[in-house]
């Protein structure tokens, strides 16, 4: 298939592009530019990953322009051209319930932009194309180094362990549980959905949350590092998800049971 990936230079985009090409698909990429919408007509699928993904971004107009308004215009153009639209939503739209039909409680500008676009998708029943949204949980894996402070705790903890011998975690990290999913699993799941003939939004996570402390201990053991607990910054407390866990009933119904990678496999396989 001919596939366009927006945000193809990002963490998930780079991994997905390489994976789809390895499966025989023709993949091209697009990065956001002001007032430019790519033409979807030459493509069988548009996979829209491009977004401001920083949960600490404060420029709401900038977030809405790129994450909501651009997404809406691109979707409408795909509908006109007959190109299936697949896009990245986020588990950050959830509160303390994680079924796809649960009450949504976004806590920051990024999460609000994803929530509003999800709502737009589900409130417009007259699309002529399939529109598929994926609420990614906490994605980790190779290629996220460029994200800096926004990379997952895997990258942060490993860097600290290797460079300083001390891994800094927030106080109470043994009770901060997240549903971490390897980017390789995300790529495989998206490819499976290429053949799914349906419009909906699905959770994409493992369904098995692990604590920040679990990950810190794995890296501490690997690099013989110490763990130091530090206070959580006040500006994060009100917008922090202390627990996430994907409910995968809809995912399983659509593509079957997926065999997820474990965090132990990833940590132990990485080079020292």
Task: Identify what each model region corresponds to.
Residues 21, 26-40:
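Adenosine-cofactor binding site in Rossmann-like domains, unifying the SAM/SAH pocket
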Residues 110, 114:
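Active-site YXXXK catalytic motif of short-chain dehydrogenase/reductase
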Residues 6, 46-50, 85-91, 134-136:
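SDR active-site strand-loop-helix element
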